[in-house]
Amino acid sequence: DKNFDEESFLVGARVAFEVVLGAYVSGDREVLKNLLSQEVYDNFRSAIDDREKAGHSIEETLVSIQAAEVVEASMEGSRAIVTTKFLSEQVHVLRDGQGEVIDGNPNEIMDVVDFWTFARDVSSQDPNWQLVATRSLD
């Protein structure tokens, strides 16, 4: 897409990263439904449902986004697809129903590498991108 502005895309991608992470942690399915493809939404919703059924709570603190960069961009017909690599610092804690830590450490900041793929139909008047894939490096 000749109108693609990488700098403003990355500004929006950083905001989306924070909003999606926050909505996932709080279990806000409505926010997620508007930002994610159906497949990604179904995966996120399933993880939230499982967490809630188990009586677990998650605390995810995004300390900082150290870097965001476009690592791949392509066109499939009128669909622009952009994969972004995020380097962030996060604190991740999963607690059981009694508040006991069952995963993570509330006092440990972890370096996290995520690859998020966004897509949008460039022939559409809608300027918003949708998150269509996620993966993390562990």
PLM regions with names:
Residues 56-96:
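Surface-exposed, charged secondary-structure patches
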Residues 7, 38-39, 65-68, 73, ...:
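Surface-exposed loop/turn and secondary-structure junction residues enriched for glycine/proline
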Residues 26, 38, 74-80, 112, ...:
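Short flexible coil/turn linkers enriched for glycine and charged/polar residues
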Residues 46-53, 63-68, 97-101, 111-114:
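Short amphipathic alpha-helical surface micro-motifs
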Residues 1-63:
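Core segments of small alpha/beta cavity-forming domains
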